């Protein structure tokens, strides 16, 4: 990807270290952003790490490294403490870097070697409502897809819908025996599912007939297939309404797609001597795991593992995936570890780098318990999104009493959905987080509203000056400390993208945008813009903030507004 300040400085330090100490064969510099301004812009900790290898004092190592680093682009290079090297870039270097950054921001950051990336996310089950658990998978997966595409990768967004299995035999049987039931919408279908499930649990004969219908469905029985397609279509329409609200683009490729490949998966695993019979089921055992991966049940039926293996192989062989990412809750971590081990053993994955399970934690209520209704059921996602929009309307009425009901109605959906997405994405994905409308709709703090307020502030500057588009052709001229801090923050955008891609964690992006917004607010406070002798140069910084905020918010799946 675009060379970042961090990667550029790393290359300088690597060359300097190898020049100073040619006896070192391989070396990867340890450069970090400085945590405090008096430590400069970046800090190098290599001298301490090399002390034992080189049998030298860290400060002497640091001095030798510094002697081999070109000084022209720095205001200062200081050795501090036991041997930390603190780097501060010159204003001239930052000015030149801003011009390059501006061009790349307009044309797009691009990786040198684009990959085919398949991201499997959301994945609700047919005949069931999407609930709050699907929220995390959907928006984390969407964010990662946006970021991978932003840097030039070819991204496939797949919805591995649960559209096959015993539940369909149960539903089909119930519909055949209760033809008066109306299933014109998902709400009725969900009620129907509960009725069918209750009968399946209580009535042994109904259970047998349901299992017979599963076999009939698998065999392609016309009447069973017709009902199955009807059930799927109703659910998919309801799912699409939610995807429209969340601005999610995703391609359906459900479990049923892989049905034709399941027998050959079992045969292939047997041919490769990977199958062990355990309690009449076909399993794959792996060293280091206490349980096996069951790939065929004792009754001869297939399961999730069989389908997931078929999907893994198809995505590599047919989709040409260089990278496969599956976004589900952390509770499925062991399943995907076993799946990866089996796929590697079978040759379905070329290497361990090909597959990543992106796990996430729970959404909790204010008491720290799993977020559910009072009756203990999962909260329906559609109801949660509707509530977010209503809460955003109330927030706007409180903070913007002067705007019309029409304006409130047009802005509230954007503010409400932005707030929900940002609150989720700003939490480390593996952590649980407490869901709070009150916190996520605040104008202060690490919220979507806080970012949007800065973006809207820039739109206000443009309106007051009668400017439609801010000029990115100006020449930057950093003078004040808050200008320098803002310039440095802008130039760190590619670093945030790098971290997000490396660890598959969107919170690096939200942390960056929050930091950038704080630096912009300090700049806005300290540096007079409109009518000042530095108006042109400062509007240039505003233009870069505007574009960076818009780009960053888009990567999170958030929308911008010109007014709040």
Swiss-Prot record:
It holds the Pfam family tRNA-synt_1d. GO terms for molecular function: arginine-tRNA ligase activity; ATP binding. The keyword Nucleotide-binding applies. Its main location: cytoplasm. GO terms for cellular component: cytoplasm. Belongs to the class-I aminoacyl-tRNA synthetase family. This is Arginine--tRNA ligase. It comes from Chlamydia caviae (strain ATCC VR-813 / DSM 19441 / 03DC25 / GPIC) (Chlamydophila caviae). The lineage of its organism: Bacteria, Pseudomonadati, Chlamydiota, Chlamydiia, Chlamydiales. The gene is argS.
